[in-house]
């Protein structure tokens, strides 16, 4: 059975790179959204349909809603919403900023000087074993 993941990221390049790493570890169905509001809507829809997400992966700096500018607080805002409304859903922060969020399942610094791919793989493997 495929791991169902929602990925909140406004960069197509980062989305492709992260998806490639995920699919090297688990069979995954990855839904990609580029803003917080659309992500929350998709999470609600998935729950209503009886097919909730197994994991959310979020950037830190992207739009809060469609057609808006990127917001540096978007990732933290998303993690807060998930903690309040969807506590069952683990969140991995994967950002070009080396930021830690204590409410996230894990944080990955997306940077070429860091083994971000190995870090993400390890988090996915650990979560898949649960």
Label each residue range with its predicted role.
Residues 32-55, 59, 63-64:
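Acidic, metal-coordinating helix/loop segments flanking the phosphotransfer/catalytic sites
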Residues 53-86:
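Conserved phosphotransfer microenvironments
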Residues 2-14, 18-22:
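Conserved acidic segment of CheY-like receiver
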Residues 97, 116-130:
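Receiver (REC) domain switch/output surface
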Residues 11-15, 61-67, 97-100:
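Short acidic, S/G/P-rich loop/turn micro-motifs used as interaction or catalytic elements
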Residues 5, 30, 91-92:
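Hydrophobic/aromatic residues located in beta-strands of well-ordered beta-sheets
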Residues 77-101, 106-108:
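A short, hydrophobic beta-strand element within the central beta-sheet of small alpha/beta folds
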Residues 25-26, 50, 86:
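A structural signal for short coil/turn segments at secondary-structure junctions
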